[in-house]
Amino acid sequence: MGVPSFFRWLSRKYPKIISPVLEEYPVIEDGVQLPLDYSSANPNGELDNLYLDMNGIVHPCSHPENKPPPETEDEMLLAVFEYTNRVLNMARPRKVLMIAVDGVAPRAKMNQQRARRFRSARDAKLQNEAREQVLREREDYGETIDENVKSKKTWDSNAITPGTPFMDKLATALRYWTSFKLATDPGWKNLQIIISDATVPGEGEHKIMNFIRSQRADTQYNPNTTHCIYGLDADLIFLGLATHEPHFKILREDVFANNNYKKPKPQDMINLSEEEKQQLIQQDSEKPFLWLHISVLREYLSAELAIPHLSFQFDFERAIDDWVFMCFFCGNDFLPHLPCLDVRENSIDILVDIWKTVLPKTKTYLTCDGTLNLEPVEALLEQLGDRETDLFKKKYIQEVRKQEAHDRRKKLKSNPNVSQGKVDRNFMIPLENMPVYDVDGNAAEGSLNLSNKDFANMRKEINLANEGDGEAAKALKLKSEKNSGVVEFSSEELKNSVQLSKTANYDAATSLQEKLIAKKMAMRDEENAEELSLKRKSEDVDSAEKETSNEPEDDEADYDEDEGSTVPPAVIHTGIVKSGFIDTDESVRLYEPGYHDRYYQHKFHVPAKDIPALQKDVIRCYVEGISWVLLYYYQGCASWTWYYPYHYAPFAQDFKNIKNLDIHFDLGEPFLPYEQLMSVLPAASGHALPEIFRPLMSDPNSEIIDFYPEEFPVDMNGKKMAWQGIALLPFIDETRLLKTVREQYSKLSDSEKARNVRKKDALLISNKNVNYDLFMKNLYGENPVNVIEFRHFKSGLSGFVTQAEEGFELNSKLICPINGGGLPDLSTNLFLKLSYTQPVVAGRCKSLVLNGYIPPQPMLTPQDRDCIIYKYSNRWNPSMMKYNIVPVGPSGITQYQPRVGGYRSFFFHKEQTAYAQQPQQNREYMHSQQRQPQGSRYQQSRYNNGNYNNSNNGYSDNNNGNTGKYNRHYNNSRGNSNRYSNSNDRRREFRR
């Protein structure tokens, strides 16, 4: 998601939310690597459901940054299997595994995808040119380059888009690999696998959200289900909070540890030896992972968002929703962030402070179950607008100070003889570097008269002479004497030679200077961060975090917050350009009076007289945008066709009279895969489309040729890194595009038409699953039915299944679609593949914690809470994370009553309550007469083991001084009770 450095900022502000992954490694016996036992206990704590945002795996496997890229697509898919298997061995889900691949996105997301893919194509072109330049230079030095190496091009990552042949192959490969694991790994026998590939519309992470909401709607749903989502997107944190599932965590690569790895340059990847390749692959496979615990983040937010002496009842769940909503103003995938806000500048803290003053006055929250309350939103933005001018000035002053500090450090580093104030080092010049000349300026007697070329060509003789070899010394002396011969030149020849020498020296110096400058600029951010860390400066020069992809800070790029070049681009500050980098902030000057009108004139290109009308439209569109984003996170996609039609956001001070706006959306329908490809791909990536569409992107006479510019400007918008710029691409005219594209559908082949469809999710189970016999009997028996509904209690999954859309046949073979890897064909009797439909959610999803929830073990101490409440400075060190171990799952006694018809984990609640109220002398008799659960209808709670269900560590009598803290948060007007008990014998059985 488009919130650069959000994860880094959050983990520094709330350090206990992250903990290291305890990873087991395969054992090698007699040179054979034995696989891990998936069924063994998980050292990280047991997990029910794991969700994989698959684009965060496919991108780094297909075009890795720290190792040579795979040679073929089959090698890419094998790398995907290996990476996925590693993630699964860390998490070890026991009930559900959902693999979600990005499908066709809403139109609001396509604008960002379009900008990314156009820039990706241009970056690939520059990378190929740089690679060819390196190869030419190596050939000039006499190195022989293989023709296969010379002809190789960078793999186009834009192929990771729904509708391409690669995505079709990926879906087939994932279905095969999961079937292979179900058939061969005993630890997977009870695992239910849902695969939502690119033919299912929707972004991967939001498919996962829809699934969780649908499961919560089942009355048999266990409110203590433990969830984990793997992905590199920053918005997964918001999604985890938006589920209101407290037993939720996020698995991701450790970006702090990844900063310690040196990123190889493209030229370093050419002609690597096999040993060097294996070394890089080994280094990449050892990258550590970490957990981000939503339960601990909720604890921090309970302290952060607490407002004493409110005149109405505080609802912690709605306060969390307000916090998530305020974070959207700092950046998201669908709207530009407000100009005055930046995560690195603690803008979220500013919004929280304002929210704490607005809430007591308005006596209502900003949001309710995903719907905006515009009156308090306007009050929030009004107060932010009052601070806006001061924020711009403060930001400018900080930037000037940072630049001055950087210039000082640069001067000290380039000239070590300049005094630094403590010890005068002006006279400390290394004498050994002085040339050996006599007083007349001639070479000293006995010195060798050799040129640089001679030294390079006679390196061997020099080394031997230094070791006492007389023959080598003699050869050097002869060469020196030969160079000492006197040659007579005319005055004109001398004059010309001097001029040529000056020119050559100037060219060489210029070339060297350019290389040095480029090198210093590339190293500048790294050096700054290191020096500031050592000196513990208060000014935090924080490079944007790498969540991704390399951020992708989001989907495909979403795994890479720091994608793109780290070298500041050459920026054009004046004039109107059609390509290259520009910076409109130079002319806007937000820190000077009059910036308001200059902002709209230079960024929106309107005259002063049209600013009021434009401003009104921009404000309305932006309010629609934040309403759409909030609904998207909490209820699902409100409209497939809506999008924000501007490249820039308005000022906070301009949000006036928005409470009367009537905001509504038309649902529409998603694009087909080829329609999205034509919307987001540049002409350079036309190879990923059927051939019939390619002329539409390149033919000058095409009706839609204006959608595919080869050159386009990038506005740096006051930023320094190339990836932070805004690509100023034309917006797609949906009507014109769809009309032109759909006219070509009749010319597609059958195989091409098969990739341009919408499908359902696939469900795969092993032949040992508890539902296998039920599904086989009713779908493939003598009297088959069309649809089977199954509930949550039996297997931890609910929904509807039908026979597989893509002809799954019993008693047949599933052919391995990948060459290499030694993977066999599979018998279809070992597993079952079905089409899966999620339960229908009736009405709106409510923002609350479900009854029957057992809180996890509290992790914060009173000191931790005080640090948040009183804003103490936090000198956090990422190396301390290894000591932070967070218990997983529920702990203690619930304060909720069971709901009628719901999950019956507390079936004996009434009987146990009656037992607790009996006189002491009657209890022994009653206890001896209690019926003990027997047979398959009863199952002991898996939470009654170890410390995960020990009442001594429970809610009411924990030792960290936080007794009763959940009382005020969860005893709210939604009907949740705060009753709880200290009995050690509670919750001993779950009854089916």
UniProtKB/Swiss-Prot annotation:
Residue ranges, annotated region (Disordered): 528-568, 916-992
First-level EC class: hydrolase
Enzyme Commission code: 3.1.13.-
Coiled-coil blocks: none
Subcellular location: Nucleus
Biased composition (Basic and acidic residues): 528-549
Domain of life, per lineage: Eukaryota
Composition-biased stretches (Acidic residues): 550-564
Any one Gene Ontology molecular-function term assigned to this protein's record: 5'-3' RNA exonuclease activity
Keywords annotated in UniProt: Exonuclease, Hydrolase, mRNA processing, Nuclease, Nucleus, rRNA processing, Transcription, Transcription regulation, Transcription termination
Compositional bias segments (type: Low complexity): 928-962, 969-983
InterPro entries tied to this protein: 5_3_exoribonuclease, Xrn1_helical, Xrn1_N, Xrn2/3/4
GO cellular component, one term: nucleus
CDD domains: PIN_XRN1-2-like
This protein's record includes keyword Flavoprotein: no
Chief location bin: nucleus
Gene Ontology annotations of biological process type: DNA-templated transcription termination; mRNA processing; nuclear-transcribed mRNA catabolic process; rRNA processing
Entry annotated with the keyword Transcription regulation: yes
Biological role stated in the UniProt entry: Possesses 5'->3' exoribonuclease activity. Required for the processing of nuclear mRNA and rRNA precursors. May promote the termination of transcription by RNA polymerase II. Essential for vegetative cell growth and chromosome segregation.
Quaternary context: Interacts with RAI1; the interaction is direct, stabilizes RAT1 protein structure and may stimulate its exoribonuclease activity. The interaction also stimulates RAI1 pyrophosphohydrolase activity, probably by recruiting it to mRNA substrates.
Family: Belongs to the 5'-3' exonuclease family. XRN2/RAT1 subfamily.
Descriptive protein name: 5'-3' exoribonuclease 2
Encoding gene (name): RAT1
